[in-house]
Amino acid sequence: MKSKFFLIIFYILFIFNSNLFSNENSKTLRVGLLAPLSGPYSEIGNSLLYSLQLALEEIDDENVVIVPRDTGFNNEKKLTSAINDMRSSGVKVVIGPTTFEEFDQVKKYNDLIFISPSNMNPDFSNNIISIGVSLESQLLALTDFIKQQKKTKTIIMYPKNQYLEFIENKLSSLDLKNTSKFTYSPNPEVLTGEIEILTNYTQRKRSLELRKKMFEDKEDDQSIKELERLDQLYTLGGVNFDSVIIIDFGNNLKSVLTSLVYTDVNQDDVLFTTINQWFDESIFYENTIKNLYYPSVNYEEFKKYNNKYFEKFKIYPNEITILAYDALGLIYYAWKTNGQINSINDFSFKDKIKGKIGTFSFKNGKVTQDLDIYKTTNKKFVKF
């Protein structure tokens, strides 16, 4: 299987480079790809390469050529060499870099335009456009959804980790109404205690015990029934919020959800929402939550893309690759619309652009996505 994998990669690179040399004319759109084709993240790089092969087949224009170059991992020398090689090959627009950490290095190449799958900064930044699903787009989609559900007291929860300052800067710039912030430790053992304070768990539990004592010595039917009802409860009284946005993912997200349920937050009264979910089915096995809502790319298109990718390459793609697929379509659209691509301003479209992941807006020097709201229920992803 491994030899077959490398054979396919060789074939794609051969086709890309053969097209490059056979289309030496001004009508050719040469698009660079900066990707880790070697090193610990080579699987992602090769997956990006596969994705662009699919996009090329759908575009079906022999005047579009991909020029892939290896950047390795965290390798400034390789990245510089790759970019210089692209420039000498007539590339004007580049898909990449894949990580925000490399932005400072590519900004100095003012003669090139970079379309990055990163989601860290949706603003047009010098010569870089990031088309990843940004935190801003997700928060705006969620706050609109929460408003539609007539919730007015939202807690935005996020961990005290390396992204703390980044998240707080984004929240400050958005100035979201009817929200308050709550930060927590990524350590599950500390987290539960912090959630207990947030939910006033100790007082609510004490209130229940005091209430039960009022009926323990009474023998009338009404008191007996009330005591039976109270025995079914874990706490008494509600919390002072009606919705939560959890900016976390993976096991950390599951720990937060578990702690909220442990502290007896009523799921019928409080709306649970989160971000950064690429239809991760492991969330199905988080039995504590009945309904979890989140904004995301178009699920049907995402499934179609994954199936098409698997049919051709017999492996499933990394999630980020669908962004590269859309990036090539976006570049091709700009090229066909303008006749050529001269600057980053050629991507300031008046109308919204529909891609595989959803609909993009490129206004006021910023990329935003119109995201759908999904919920996990009965081990399914359901569009709300």
Where are these regions (language model features)?
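Extracytosolic ligand-binding ectodomains
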Residues: S3-L13, L20-F384
